[in-house]
Amino acid sequence: MAVGDSDLQGYDEAQKKMMNENCIIVDENDKITGQDSKVNCHLGNGKLHRAFSVLIFNSNEKLLIQQRADEKITFPSIWANSCCSHPLYQDGEEEGIEGAKKAASRKLVQELGIRPNAIRTEDLNFITKMHYKARADEKWIEHEVDYIFVVKIDVEIDPNPNEIQKTQYVDEEELNDLFDKANGNDVKIGPWFRLIKDNFLSKIWRNLESIESINDNEVHHMGEVE
């Protein structure tokens, strides 16, 4: 689907351009079955594709979270983890964990303005994968096998305003307070971030000094969520 098609009319030009990038289509066991544009992967009922979520903790063990820009086509303005996006069907990004790490490194620069190689692929600790589906609205959907990565590092950020409108470092109590506000509809939380928090984050926080000890290569099937 080309930029300029009716489904993308009225959206931000930079965001529209990225919707023509090709995602990696997979089955529920994360086996590659093909490729298709981000538009086709997220429109209507969507197509199951790979994604990644990075959790950046500083030396005080506070988690970097972001509020997505209003310009985002799917899930604009919601709060999410440090960085989340998609491996593309290019440049070796389709090569499982290592490919997802390459994609994460690319987006850490493009979204958060982190200096290239300030966070290397080998710094990213793979935790697990989760399969979920969540509607953004009547038009757009997420249906992903999401690779979760953790890194503990102090790093300078310069967020891209076309991607991110706000960032914040939070401890576990502060994050719980944010989620409580979301339960009262005062703020909105990305459904993938809620799944990470509800299923993995407390264990990650408790094991930041031995993070390699809690990884697995399972695909955790979460079903359809709000």
Region spans (language model):
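Nudix hydrolase/Nudix homology domain
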Residues: 1-7, 83, 125-226
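A short coil-to-beta-strand element that immediately follows conserved catalytic motifs
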Residues: 116-128
